[in-house]
Every structure is written in C-alpha cells, then in structure tokens.
Regions:
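Short hydrophobic, aromatic-rich alpha-helical segments embedded in or entering the lipid bilayer
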Residues: 1-7, 177-207, 294-297, 479-508
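Aromatic- and glycine-rich beta-strand/loop motifs that create alpha-glucan
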Residues: 1-26, 30, 236-248, 255, ...
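A structural motif at transmembrane helix-loop-helix junctions in multipass membrane proteins
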Residues: 18-21, 135-173, 314, 431-434, ...
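Transmembrane helix segments
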Residues: 25, 32-38, 155-190, 325-331, ...
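Long, hydrophobic alpha-helical segments
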Residues: 54-77, 315, 354-380
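Transmembrane helix boundary and interhelical loop/hinge segments in multi-pass membrane proteins
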Residues: 68-90, 338-341, 370-393
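Alpha-helical transmembrane segments and their short interhelical loops
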Residues: 100-152, 210, 403-455, 515-516
C-alpha cells in the first residue's frame, strides 16, 4: 500500500510536466539570479559573512520554497482520497507513510537542484555542511507544508500561509545582516542559515545552532505526521459500516415511471403544447439591459462567494502588516544615495535605508498577495464558470465578476501595505506613491489570472513567487546602487517601480513615460488574460445553442414532460440530450 501511494502521488504530481520543470528550475533561478544580490544586500546590512557563504544560504532558501509548496499541495489535494484508502484498507499508517515519502522525494529533488546550482554558481567550500544543512531546511519546510495542508481547507489560504512564512523567514528570520535578535530566532530558517553561512557563535546557547536546527526539523516533522494521521484515520462509523454489509444500509429502489407497464398507469387526457421560436435577435435595448444585469449578477455572486472566505481577508490584512513592519524594523537607518527624477530634473538624494526598504517591501507584499489572489480566484471556479456560460453568460461577463474580487483584494493589500509603511516614513507625494503601488499589485494580479489556466495552481504559484521576488524585490530596487539594475527594465514592474520611488522621495511631477509603460503593461496583460480565460471556458455559439427538432411537449399524467413527434424516442423525457445533428433552422423547443 505504501509503495502504491508513493507511485500514484508522484505520477499525479508529474501529470503536469511543468511541475517537474519548475521543481528543478525554481531553485536554480533563485540561486543563480539572487545569490549575488543577496550578498550585496548582506554587505549593505553590515554582515560579516563572505559572499560565498551567503550564496550557500540561498541554496537552502530555494529548497525551502519548493519543498514547502510541494508538501502542501501533496496533502491538500488528496485528503479525501487518502481517507477513503485508509477506510478500505482499515489502516491509515501505510497511506500516511506513502504520502510523506512522496513529499520527501520532492524535497530531495529540490535539494539536489539547489546544490547543483550552487556548485555551478560559486562552488561549495564545505560539502558536508552544505548538503546536510540544505537537506534539513527542505525537511523543515516539507513539514510546514504538510502541517498547513492538514489545518486549512482552502488551497488559496494555505498557499498564502506557506508563501508568507517563507518570505518572512528569508527577509526577516534568516538574519541577513548578521544579527540574531529575539524576533529572528523564532523563525525556522534562522539557525540553519547560521550553519550554512558559518556564523555559528553560540547564539543557540548550549544546544548550539546545529542542535536548534535539528529540533526544528524533528519537532515540525512530528507535528506534521501526527496531524496527517489524525485527518487520514477513518471515522469509527466509516469503519463499521462495511462490516455490517447490506443490512446496515439497504439500497434504495428507484423505479422510473416510464419503465412501468401500461396497465400501471391510469390513462388520462394529455395536454400537448407546441412552442416554436424564431432566430430573430432581441431588441438592442433589451439585450443591453440583460447584459448589464448579468454583469452585475456575476460580480455580486463572485463577491458573495469570496466574502464567505473570512480567513482570506484576514490574511490579506495581517500579512502586509507583518511583512512590511518586520522587514523595516530589522533594517538600519544609515543613509544611502538614490537617483530620482522630478519632472525634467535628475538628481541624487541621500535617504535612509530603512525608508527605502519600507517603501519597497510594501510593493513586494502587494504584488505577491495580489498575484496569488488572481491565480486562485480564476482556477478555483472553472467548472462553475463553464456552467454560467452554458446558462447564457458571456465569458467576459464571468471574467468581470472575478476581476472585481481580484481588484478588491489588490486594493485592500495596497491600502494596508501603505498604512504600515507610513509608520516608518512619510512619502513626499501620496497620490503617485499609492497609485504606483496599486499599479504593481494589479499588474501581478493579471499575471496570476494569465498563468492560472496555462500552468495550473502549483506551477503558477512557483512562477509568481519567483517573479515577485526577482522583479519587485530585486529588479526594481535601489538598495544596492543609486538606480535600479538594467536587467529589471525587461520585467513587468519597471514602470510602477520607478513611479513608486519618485512619488515616495521626490516632489516633482511623475514621468509620463513610466506611467504609460505601467498602464500599457497592465492593459496588455489584461487582454492576454481575457483571451486565455475565454479559450478555457468559452464555447462557440453552436455549443451554447441546443438545437431540437420540431416536436411537441406532452405533459404526462405523472407530471413529466415527453417529446412527441417523428424524431422523439419512446423513452426521451425532458432533461435528455438533444440530437446535436439537428438543424437550428427547424426551430427550437422551449421546455
């Protein structure tokens, strides 16, 4: 049973080949693209680590990101299946062991990819230390992912929790500046990072950094195993019911009225109604009013649906507060040069590093949360969206309802992020600064809407997580130099990032070029997302129209309806499928 669960879990993970590609590609991108930037950031925060040692830490962080999300999706998507397997076999242990082993295989694959990238990037000075520490980090985050998967029911909420834990762990708990405050020590990655960067200096007391790392790994793993066993173990009544056999739950006898003999049905007069419709279009004003009604109904239904998910809105409120406040609090107040633009004037100003970090972390939090919201809102309602299209809604009306929810989530995270950042600095121009932050959030929300149908939830989440950090966190930052890196010009947040910095730290008018760049990128992403959404759930007019032969509707004595006519089958009742080959020109029968 255990081997079967492992095999099926890995095959299910590999059902989308992109998942396997990203399992290897994400650690490689994080190590290759961010290790140098993180080394510069660490020097900026007065760290004592050498760049090579800090690059070793990026391998652990990359493995943690992939392993945590892989462990979460392994559990959240198979809870019902695992419970049924445990009920059929009478034992939950093989199922739990198989699920955990499959998650461990994915963690080992992510660890191997991160270590190979580290060797290619800078080499490994101490292979034993690096391999063991990165593996411990992967185990810690697999346990976190599994634990979150057993505690939450919504994939969106769980993905947000795992992603935010990882980002807080990297930006706050890892101790990039070489510090080890009380706040940083409560994060799981702090002590393994100290081991990876050779900064162990008895911060962990007599147990040591290695001891605390092992305590984190063993403790979280034990909690994850216990929780997974609890939710997988079949309920008592589910285990007793199969033993009772058919006597416990006798099958219900269902008799179709149409299968009864003719003598069983008392003859009665039947009412025959023939309804035909023409193909003439409705009046323009009536069609316009119906379109507005459907658009409002789609928006109202989407808001009501996600309004019930109170945990989501709590996360959207709490996460920016924690992320921005903790990141800014750990940043020193030293001055640094920042290149700014005020109208036609280009100048360099000396600004506190804490102010810059608070401003930029607000945009990172907004981008990440809005992107995840866009991804899960679209992918979580595909079947319902298709039903709405069959009911007569146009794909653009359905998409508009989803975009209303996504825009609300993006606006909420933006407002909260700006409010928290305002506790650390006061922007020179609130409107350009807030508008730029909102543009970045909406841009990443559209990226989530675009990626969801193309890559699936897990693949899209990997891409959004990496892109938000690489683009907003490092591609548009001025914390390493006085101006953003040149390679960031090819990423989506360049226009909004420049507007954000100029609005936060200069008093001149915004540059029209960057504003047009941000709006143009948002418009292009929205158009692309609409096309992908329509291709996924949209249907042609012929598919939405149910042609029927010219027949009559007979109301039977039992209150059922039956087609009469030369093409009606004897057993055909209302609700059966029409012949798709029938011609629309012959009319349509309304039921």
């Amino acid at each position: 049973m255990t081997a079967l669960v492992i095999r099926r879990a890995l095959l299910d993970y590999a059902r989308r080949p992109l998942n396997l590609v990203l399992l290897v590609a994400v650690p490689v991108v994080i190590v290759m693209a961010l290790s140098g930037e993180l080394a510069a950031f660490s020097k900026l925060l007065s760290t004592t680590s050498s760049p090579t040692h800090l690059e070793a830490a990026t391998a652990g962080w990359a493995a943690a990101a992939v392993a945590g999300l892989a462990g979460f999706f392994e559990v959240i998507g198979s809870r019902t299946t695992d419970r049924r397997l445990a009920a059929d076999s009478g034992r939950a242990t093989p199922v739990v062991a198989g699920r955990l082993a499959a998650s461990a295989v994915l963690a080992v694959a992510a660890t191997a990819a991160a270590l190979v990238a580290l060797v290619a990037r800078s080499g490994i000075n101490d292979p034993l230390r690096a391999i063991s520490a990165v593996l411990v980090v992967a185990i810690i985050y697999v346990a976190i992912g599994v634990l979150v998967g057993t505690l939450v029911r919504s994939e969106m909420n769980g993905a947000l929790v795992v992603s935010v834990i990882w980002m807080l762990d990297v930006f706050v708990g890892a101790g990039l500046g070489g510090g080890s405050s009380v706040i940083t020590r409560v994060f799981p990655l702090h002590f393994p990072t100290m081991v990876l960067t050779s900064q162990a200096a008895h911060r962990g007391g007599p147990i040591g950094d290695v001891g605390w790392s092992l305590i984190w790994a063993i403790g979280l793993s034990a909690l994850a195993v216990a929780r997974l066993a609890v939710i997988t173990r079949p309920a008592r009544h589910a285990a007793i019911a199969p033993a009772l056999g058919e006597a416990a739950t006798p099958p219900r006898q269902t008799v179709s009225p149409l299968s009864l003999p003719a003598a069983a049905v008392t003859p009665a007069p039947s009412l025959t109604v023939t309804v035909t419709t023409s193909d003439a279009p409705f009046a323009a004003n009536r069609a316009h009013a119906r379109s507005e009604t459907r658009l409002a109904a789609a928006l109202r239904a989407a808001m009501r649906d996600y309004g019930r998910n109170r945990v989501l809105w709590v996360l959207l409120l709490v996460v920016p507060v924690l992320f921005v406040a903790l990141a800014a609090e750990q940043t020193p107040t030293k001055l640094m040069p920042v290149a700014l633009v005020a109208g036609a004037r280009h100048f360099t100003a000396m600004i506190s590093l804490r102010h810059v970090h608070a401003a930029e972390m607000a945009s990172v939090a907004s981008a990440l949360l809005a992107g995840i919201a866009g991804l899960f809102v679209v992918t979580g309602s595909a079947e319902g969206d298709r039903r709405l299209v069959l009911a007569g809604f146009r794909p653009r009306q359905v998409l508009a309802g989803h975009l209303g929810v996504i825009a609300g989530a993006a606006a909420l995270t933006t407002v909260v992020s700006l409010a928290v950042s305002a506790a650390f600095f006061s922007p020179h121009q609130w409107v350009p600064y807030a508008g730029a932050d909102l543009l970045i959030a909406l841009t990443y929300a559209m990226i989530g809407v675009l990626l969801g149908p193309l890559t699936g939830r897990l693949g899209g989440l990997y891409l959004i997580l990496v892109l938000a950090i690489v683009d907003v966190g490092y591609g548009q930052t001025v914390m390493f130099k006085s101006f953003p890196p040149s390679w960031g010009a090819f990423l989506p947040a360049r226009g909004g990032g420049r507007l954000l910095l100029d609005g936060a730290f200069s008093s001149g008018s915004a540059q029209i070029g960057y504003l047009l760049l941000a709006l143009g990128g948002l418009g292009a992403l929205t158009a692309a997302a609409a096309l992908v959404f329509k291709a996924r759930i949209g249907m042609s007019r012929a598919q939405r129209t149910i042609p029927a032969p010219p027949s009559a509707v007979e109301v039977t004595p039992l209150g059922l309806t039956r087609l009469t006519g030369p093409l009606a089958a004897p057993e055909q009742t209302c609700g059966a499928k029409w012949d798709p080959g029938a011609r629309k020109s012959e009319g349509r029968t309304e039921r």
